[in-house]
Amino acid sequence: MKSLVLKNPNQDWHPNIWPPFTQIINSKPQLEVTHGKNALIYTKNPKQELIDGISSWWVTLHGHSNDYIADAIYHQAKTLEQVIFADFLHPQAQILSERLSGLTKLERLFFSDNGSTAVEVALKIAYQSWQNQGETRNQIIAFDGAYHGDTFGAMALGERNIFNENFDNLMFPVKRVPWPSTWINDEEVEIKENNAIQILTKLLKKPTVAVILEPLVQGAGGMNMVRPEFIRQVSKVVKNNNSLLIADEVLTGFGRCGSLFAFQKANIIPDLISISKGLTGGFLPMGITLAKETIFQSFISDSPKKTFWHGHSFTANPLGCAAANASLDLLEKDPIKYLSFEEKHLSHIKKIKKLPFVKNIRVTGTIAAFDIEIGKNKGYLNNVGKRIKALSIKKGLFIRPLGNVIYLLPPLCITDKQLEKSYRIIFEILSDL
């Protein structure tokens, strides 16, 4: 294999680290962090205080170094740090399972490690469930613009793009339905929704393993938002055609969309739910797939072939479960933090709306986004996002635009003053473009 020797390697990059989603020859080196607290990140060189405007890839739900969650992990670590979950049960997993089952109305939980595996598990469960019932189904339906993770099954479900095109020949086919993205003052939303439902209904005439979607907001695809009414229509059509609905709540769960789970805004109950990111408050990696009891029962058999042969070394890790229980405590103690966040975004975003190249402003819960129509490329490879990111960091705000999509997704603990400053920085930068 030939190796690429960089002509002018950037010596500021660590010589042993391979950073995610990054081409180092045209990206700025990682900033060294000394510590974080609440909505702030502190860097070493340059010495700087940054507002974490995207919750460190959407995970730090309650901010950095939350004392309550840190204490819960510390006390659990002194009791039990890890145990094989195939043979042993521990209190933190029991408590977490009972709480999440009660909150989602789905009875069974399967633990894994992250968002991609939580989606992968949901897909495997759905596929094998039909097999266990004597049905061979191969069709899977997802939506245009979707991103469900980076393991092979999750990649196959996502939109074919720069993230996964190198592996296209290794991925199974998936049927696609248009995603009726909407925004403030969108006059064509119902037309787009009706078109999508018609296409979905036609596809579902063929026996289908499952339909998977990111309820209300497609994250990495560009913070593409839809109305709760559309999610409700999808659920109805899926149910009427005897298929399964998988809700990928890896991003949208735990208050991010203005309700504890995004599917609740649509007043539906999916057949399977994948959760991660905010699950542990951002402290530890953990994924969970929730399933209805009827699905679980399809695996109960004397036949070994009907067993769900899947597992992870750190399944239901006690430290992760303790962090997740502590995070749920905080959400239950002060739900107004996520219930009222949308109003804060709307009060600040009015000023940005006036700029001529700002388009498609949209807000759902704690997430606010808009498009910058500058340059020919309107997708992830539009360099305007990199320019805005670099300028924002200089001014004290960390954001990571998705190409020409600028968004804010801060921790729930961000102060009104910090949120106002975040919007002010973005407005100042955009005004000078």
PLM regions and their residue ranges:
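Conserved N-terminal phosphate-binding loop of PLP-dependent enzymes in the Aspartate aminotransferase
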Residues: 1-433
